């Protein structure tokens, strides 16, 4: 990220991610259409879809380059969150979090070529898991992830605790 516009966008993302997520922001078509599960996981409602890919905020992963491993995804996730001044660490569904924390879960879809073709994030805050798919409104999942993803072709990579 080198341009003035990119720096301003990053500042706005940093500002929104350090506040409690306001889900009513997704009621506007602009926010709904220009954010995804990754921006939702980090708590950003800033309209800039090209930055909401793991590794893009930190500038470590070009948009057109595929992901090669879950380890790479995790490393890039940590780099992105560091760039917006959020602390992220491994966690579990059972771990209790404080008021200034929330959890995210990272899922990947791996195809026959063993490359990661897609990722998905969910967010845990106020005792509930929720998610956002592309242009849709956030959706409540419930208090546990255990039943939600048994039928999905997604693989859970990890659950992470985020501190604002």
Regions found by a protein language model. Name each.
Residues 3-86:
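Cysteine-nucleophile protease catalytic domains, especially the papain-like/related folds used
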Residues 46-50, 114, 138:
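An almost-null, non-specific background feature
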Residues 64-136:
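...with weaker cross-activation on analogous glycine-rich loops/strands in unrelated enzymes
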């Amino acid at each position: 990220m080198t341009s003035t516009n990119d720096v301003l966008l990053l500042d706005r993302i940093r500002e929104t991610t350090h506040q409690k997520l306001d889900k009513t922001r997704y009621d506007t078509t602009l926010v709904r259409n220009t954010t995804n599960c990754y921006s939702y996981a980090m708590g950003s409602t800033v309209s800039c879809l090209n930055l909401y890919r793991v590794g893009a905020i930190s500038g470590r992963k070009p948009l057109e380059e595929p992901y090669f491993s879950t380890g790479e995804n995790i490393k890039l996730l940590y780099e992105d969150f560091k760039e917006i001044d959020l602390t992220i660490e491994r966690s579990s569904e059972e771990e209790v979090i404080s008021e200034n924390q929330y959890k995210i879960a990272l899922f990947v879809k791996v195809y026959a070529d063993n490359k990661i073709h897609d990722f998905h994030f969910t967010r845990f805050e106020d005792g509930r898991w929720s998610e956002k798919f592309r242009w849709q409104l956030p959706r409540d999942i419930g208090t546990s992830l255990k039943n939600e993803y048994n039928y999905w072709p997604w693989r859970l990579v990890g659950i992470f605790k985020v501190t604002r």
